[in-house]
Each structure stands twice: as C-alpha cells, then as structure tokens.
C-alpha cells in the first residue's frame, strides 16, 4: 500500500476534449517490482492527448487520464529496477511498456518503440492479463515500467524537458537516424509544437542549413529566432515550390493534415532525398502520391514513431549539453481543461506544460 492517491483529470467520453475532463481518483496498473511510481511535477500537453480524449485515432477505453510528457520525482522503485533510485528526477514519454522478451527483435535491439507484441502506451492502453489500464500525467502520480523511465540530466529544467519526452523525441529520432548533420540541408514542415523541436535539434546536430516550412509568413520571425536559416511560407509565397525545388537533403514533416501538399513537399528534395512523416491525422490518411513523382527523382518516403528509451536519454543529454530550451508556456494543472482548449485553438508558442503546484 502507498500513502498517496492516484488522482488526475479524467476524460469519461469524447466530450472531454471540449474542456470537460473531471478530476477524480483512478486505479493504476497493479504494482510489480519492475515499476516506478512518479510524483508528477510537470506534464506537457501533446496533440496526442486531444486525439485520444476524442477517440480520434482509435476507441479510447474511458475513463482516461492523458499526458505522456511527464517529469517528476521517483517515490517508489521496484526491486528489479536498476537505473532509477528513489528521489531521482525522472521522465516518461509516450510508451509505458513493451513485451521486453529476449526473442523480440525490436526489444532486444533498442527499438522498444516498434515492438508489436506487447506495446503499452503511457495512457489509454489496457495491460495484458489483469494488470489494469495505463493512466497518464495530468495527475498527481504515475506508475510506469522502469525500463521506460529516464533520468533528467542536470542543467535541463523540468518544464523544458517535459515536452521533449514526446514532442522532442518524435523529431529528434528521425533527424538523427536519417543523417541530419554537417553537410546536410534539412527542412522542417510545420513549425508548431513538434516543428520547433525539429529546428532546434537539426541545428544542434550540426546541419549546414535548416529551413522552416509553414503556411503563414507571420511565423517567420519566430522560426528564424529558433535558429532556422531560411523560411518558406506556403500560403503566402506563390512560387515557393518552384523557387525552392531540389534544395533539401531531408525533410521531416510534422503536419497532421490529409490535405497537405505532399507532392510539392517532395519536390523540395534533391535527387535521392528523404521525407519522413511524423504527423498523423485522425484516420491516418495522407494525400495520394503519383508513382512518377517518386521514380523521377529517386525520392524515399518513410515514417517514424516516438523513440526508444535510449533515444530519449541521448536527446536529453544533447539538450543539456547544447543548452537547448523548449519554447513553452506553463499553466497550472488545475487549468488543464482551458489549456487543452487553447492548445486546440493553436495558441501555444509552442508547447504548454502543466505544472502540478503541489509537487513543483
């Protein structure tokens, strides 16, 4: 038994995405000696939270407490957890467990985020057997398997680290794994919560040139302040596609729209260039692509989903070493309902972080 309660903002149906979450107690997964209990101090608001609250990607097993950009203090650590001790400042991203079997090619090779045997998300998942459900970080406490709990390096603030645990890693992982670095010109499509990390990390990884790509010219000042070398406004620059054709080695697209000009984005790539899609619209449908668009320029298209625990640790250390700061606005946890509405309305520059004032 613990001397603390698991309480948080619960969505009971799809209307909870309209700012109708209700504070209440929930039962975390059954404790095992592989788990860590975290006293939550900070939790970023991610677009995934809104998709899940409204059952946009899949039917949500309500009640659901969202939030998978969690930072806090480890207050209970299972005997089999070797990397964390009580009192450590720790974080949890979008994944709470995988199958963790030695014969799983993904789990045994640092690709736990692609395990297809036993993937458990930080919230909205049902554990196998009778272990219960996963509940996220819009809460006082969180319980997660210790393999997916990472230490937050000294020198990196909790409010800056929290949104990196999903938003940051979603773009850091494909940048690093697709050759972002010296000699490369990189484009980031969509400069919001995810895209602003794309610019920060592309520069930190040493890309020669980083180009921000979004719809409106009004974002240019912010994008250049983040460190981008150039900016393309697709709504306001009439000839953007032809003027910038075949100039980029790598594009990471954070846009979650089935109507995005995907063919035109591909045209920005040099011959043999790569586009990695990380944004996922409700339903998952992307615009169609003509085969000749790919054949004529040897384009490669791929995808990337979050990152492994080792990827996250590497990203956090880079952020600490390079003194990367997230562009965030903090909000009290008690204002979570209004904060998700403001997030949906696009008011965040560029991420909201909920602060649990009882534990901060």
What are these regions (language model features)?
Residues 215-222, 284-291, 311-312:
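Short, glycine/polar-rich helix-capping loops at beta-to-alpha or helix-loop-helix junctions
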Residues 98-189:
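NAD(P)H dinucleotide-binding glycine-rich loop of Rossmann-like/cofactor-binding domains
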